[in-house]
Design a protein with these regions (language model features):
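Beta-rich, blade/repeat-based domains predominating
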Residues: 64-76, 111, 132-152, 193-222, ...
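Short, solvent-exposed loop/turn segments at conserved positions within beta-propeller repeat blades
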Residues: 90-110, 163-169, 227-228, 275-281, ...
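Residue-level signature of beta-propeller blades and closely related beta-rich strand-turn architectures
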Residues: 85, 159-161, 228, 272, ...
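A short loop-to-beta-strand structural motif that recurs across blades of beta-propeller domains
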Residues: 110-115, 171-174, 231-234, 281-285, ...
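Short loop/turn segments that connect beta-strands within beta-propeller blades
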Residues: 118-122, 177-181, 236-240, 287-291, ...
Length: 404
């Protein structure tokens, strides 16, 4: 599913190029989105601008970012960063379904971008003019994640779509030309989510354009976790997109935010709805290598499902997971937004946890404030986006050394 070419080129802060002229046709129920914070975190419930304790150790490599989210190292050794932008002033009220107060309606604009932190510590803009939104409580979303496949840069768009004030720039995946900063959509995920609805969406927390939050490369495809509908999709480089699993069918509204791959299995982490309850988040194992066939009426395993990803295992004990990564030690690391029990995220309560081989869960980094994403670098250090939901100009990139 390929859209017409769209490009964004930075030149003195101006974006040049055209965007695909298209109008989304809504096929979903009216939005009652009172808790999009479940997928996007929430400034309404946290004073993230307050003074917070710093992380337990580490170095600030860059600052002044706009709610940075996912990040990935490129073949050139540089770190590429998803920047949410600052939203915009465009309103689509009366045009399509809107999020309800106190979260919506949203206002959009082409202010999101992709940043590059090179090996000398210089921060530059790689691509700009990408869709971004701001809601009534100040949450920002634009570029959600970045990944490299066959040395080409792909970016996941989470701030697009008509319901977010960007009717001509949907949520989806774009391919970025690193030579000139131009970008093209390879798939329209806004339209895909509407044409392939989840089995059990939460009507009180529904986003028509979805909330694609994280993306990884697995088996030569781009796997995307959508947090609001609870679906995981896979997209090939030609734009062909398929639904891998509908998590809502077996798990309900758990707000999956992250996915990691190990061999042929996928590992999904979830945020859980707010208010926060400690250790309610899980790591869910998905596998296609399951021999179990359920014959219970109404629950019977269909023949077509035997070769698909199914839930194989689940491990609780985590809180508000926003990213999962495997380390060089083969162990799984989880980035937590905040472990404040019985409430909402607090500055300084973000952590990185490690699931050890004996099953224990160990804190390896603490003192983070609303982290948005993490990745391991070629030096085996952890790179984390800190202040990932704190407003324009507050975001940081941290480098943390953890013993593996």
């Amino acid at each position: 599913m390929k859209l017409s070419r769209s490009s964004g080129k930075e030149q003195s802060g101006t974006v040049f190029g055209s965007s695909p002229k298209r109008r989304l046709t809504l096929k979903t129920p009216p939005s009652l989105a009172l808790l999009f914070v479940g997928a996007l975190l929430a400034n309404a419930f946290v004073n993230s601008h307050a003074q917070a304790p710093g992380p337990s150790s580490g170095t600030v490599l860059a600052s002044g970012l706009n709610d940075p989210r996912g990040l990935a190292f490129g073949p050139d050794g540089a770190l590429y960063i998803a920047d949410s932008g600052t939203g915009g002033t465009n309103s689509t009220v009366g045009t399509c379904t809107q999020g309800l107060p106190p979260i919506g309606p949203y206002k959009g604009g082409p202010s999101a971008k992709i940043l590059k932190l090179d090996t000398n510590g210089k921060l530059t803009t790689v691509a700009s003019g990408l869709p971004s939104f701001i809601n009534l409580i100040g949450d920002l979303m634009g570029v959600s994640d970045v990944a490299f496949l066959h040395d080409k840069l792909y970016a996941l768009i989470g701030g697009g779509g008509c319901s977010h004030g960007n009717p001509d720039l949907p949520n989806g995946i774009v391919r970025v030309n690193l030579n000139n900063g131009k970008w093209d959509y390879i798939t329209d995920l806004s339209l895909f989510y509407m044409e392939h609805p989840a089995a059990y969406p939460d009507d009180a927390d529904f986003e028509p354009d979805g909330a694609p939050y994280s993306m990884i490369v697995h088996n030569d495809r781009l796997f995307v976790v959508e947090s609001n509908h609870g679906t995981i999709t896979a997209t090939s480089t030609d734009g062909a997109t398929t639904k891998i699993i509908d998590m809502s069918l077996s798990q309900g509204h758990i707000i999956p935010t992250s996915v990691a791959a190990n061999n042929d299995n996928l590992y999904v982490g979830n945020l859980t709805p707010f208010p926060i309850f400690s250790q309610r988040a899980r790591v869910i194992t998905l596998s296609r290598n399951l021999s179990f066939v359920d014959t219970t009426p109404g629950l019977a395993t269909k023949a077509a499902d035997l070769s698909k990803f199914r839930v194989a295992n689940s491990r609780a004990g985590f809180t508000t997971i926003v990213s999962l990564k495997f380390g060089t030690d083969g162990l799984l690391y989880a980035l937590e937004l905040s472990d404040t029990p019985g409430g909402y995220p607090n500055p300084g309560d973000g952590k990185v946890l490690r699931l050890n081989a004996d099953g224990t869960i160990q804190t390896v980094v603490s003192g983070l404030t609303l982290p948005g994403g993490m990745t391991f670098g070629p030096d085996n250090a952890l790179y984390i986006t800190n202040f990932g939901d704190s407003g324009p100009g507050k975001g940081q990139i941290l480098r943390m050394v953890v013993e593996q």
